């Protein structure tokens, strides 16, 4: 009986890692510049060996931040200036459709004509506070011969508050200085200028679903080896459907709740190695490729413009950069009854997005693609998790609960966000 109990624990442990890794990497709407990847939905009750096992997992967590990692040596900056200060001196340069009778356009033309100096004249900075609360839902169904399928959907509540503008022009700047009539006229008309171009640089508060993931995977395991307890491998491919709310191009700081309307295909592979009946090491990696799409977006009209504020908009083909990720973990499995501890690391990044404007007479492709906001991002994350599973031998229903922390520790062009929360899930084993 004691030997059988050890065998059951061994089986449940290595099957938990198959699904653990599958749910971690295959919840494809999980890699964004504004928060670390969730790593709490999958670590819980060990996976049982029955081929028709059904699982439902929920993870919920949140955090807030006023800081971001900019583009130099993991340095921190204010949240909304992660691409550097905004060059408002040339914000109206080459913008099509200006009205020579409009006071807003006159202010833009006069500002661009003024010869600035290399002392941040005409530059501003934006600050704000970003809050996120997210729920991840994942349904997993085991089939036969190691095959399984998954359906994942996130629900996100995001808000941006305390948005403020700071003039970076130093008082000691030589002519033209902070008191320049042209600059002060621009600042006085700034809100009207944004409104004139259908823009709003303010707060937002929204709740919506993210992008739906449908995944098919295959797992295999090797056990009863001389040195190792087991080795688990799995391979997955899935589709990412654009069910999330798209970015509002008329809101300067708006963030889409998914991948902004782009269809995606994800592939990944994982490995887990168990030793000593209580220690597990593993690694994983994958990539998400997106289909291009033609839509209305904001674009730069001068290579010297910088930041989120772009007055001109037009149709362009948007080709998002590939997202790829890799990581590893170590797990102390069932060190006290059903209690386990886990620590891990993930590196994820998105490559540069490419734009192809439809009207190349109004939008120079070189200028539109010389945009830091299209340049991609990368993120380093530390994961910590503690969980307890309530599995009992002979029971078909096995619940679990856990708590996690996902900590962003470095990167470029990302929010400096820490997400903490909890997860709950259960397995149902069927007998046929």
Predicted regions and their residues:
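Outer-membrane beta-barrel pore domains and translocons
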Residues: 61-63, 154-158, 219, 238-242, ...
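Long, hydrophobic, well-ordered secondary-structure blocks that form the structural core
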Residues: 150-270
């Amino acid at each position: 009986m004691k030997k059988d109990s050890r065998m059951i624990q061994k089986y449940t442990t290595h099957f938990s890692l198959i699904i653990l890794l599958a749910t971690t990497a295959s919840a494809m709407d999980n890699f964004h510049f504004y928060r670390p990847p969730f790593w709490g939905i999958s670590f819980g009750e060990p996976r049982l060996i029955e081929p028709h096992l059904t699982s439902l997992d929920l993870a919920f967590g949140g955090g807030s931040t006023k800081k971001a990692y900019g583009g130099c040596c993991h340095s921190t900056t204010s949240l909304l200036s992660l691409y550097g200060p905004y060059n408002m001196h040339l914000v109206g340069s080459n913008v099509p459709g200006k009205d020579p009778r409009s006071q807003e356009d006159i202010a833009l033309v006069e500002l661009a004509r003024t010869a600035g100096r290399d002392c941040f004249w005409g530059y501003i900075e934006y600050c704000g506070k970003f809050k996120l609360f997210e729920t991840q839902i994942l349904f997993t169904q085991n089939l036969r011969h190691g095959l399984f399928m998954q359906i994942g959907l996130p629900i996100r509540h995001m808000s941006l508050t305390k948005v403020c503008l700071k003039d970076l022009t130093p008082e000691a700047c030589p002519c033209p200085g902070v008191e320049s009539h042209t600059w002060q006229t621009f600042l006085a008309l700034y809100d009207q200028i944004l409104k004139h171009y259908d823009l709003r640089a303010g707060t937002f508060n929204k709740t919506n679903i993210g992008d739906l993931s449908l995944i098919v995977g295959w797992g295999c395991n090797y056990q009863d080896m001389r040195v190792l307890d087991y080795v688990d491998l799995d391979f997955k491919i899935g589709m990412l459907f654009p069910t999330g709310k798209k970015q509002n191009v008329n809101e300067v700081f708006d963030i889409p709740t998914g991948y902004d309307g782009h269809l995606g295909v994800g592939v990944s592979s994982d490995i887990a190695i168990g030793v000593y009946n209580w220690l597990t090491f593993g690694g994983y990696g994958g990539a998400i490729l997106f289909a291009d799409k033609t839509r209305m977006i904001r674009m730069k009209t001068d290579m010297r413009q910088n930041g989120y504020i772009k007055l001109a908009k037009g149709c362009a083909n948007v080709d998002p950069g590939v997202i790829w990720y890799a990581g590893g973990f170590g797990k102390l499995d069932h060190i006290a009854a059903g209690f386990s501890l886990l620590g891990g690391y993930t590196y994820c990044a998105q490559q540069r997005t490419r734009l192809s404007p439809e009207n190349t007479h109004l939008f120079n492709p070189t200028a539109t693609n010389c945009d830091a906001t299209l340049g991609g991002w990368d993120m380093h994350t530390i994961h910590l998790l503690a969980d307890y599973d309530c599995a009992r031998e002979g029971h078909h229903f096995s619940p679990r609960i856990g708590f996690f922390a996902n900590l962003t520790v470095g990167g470029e062009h990302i929010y400096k966000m820490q997400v903490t929360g909890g997860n709950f899930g259960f397995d149902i084993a069927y007998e046929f």
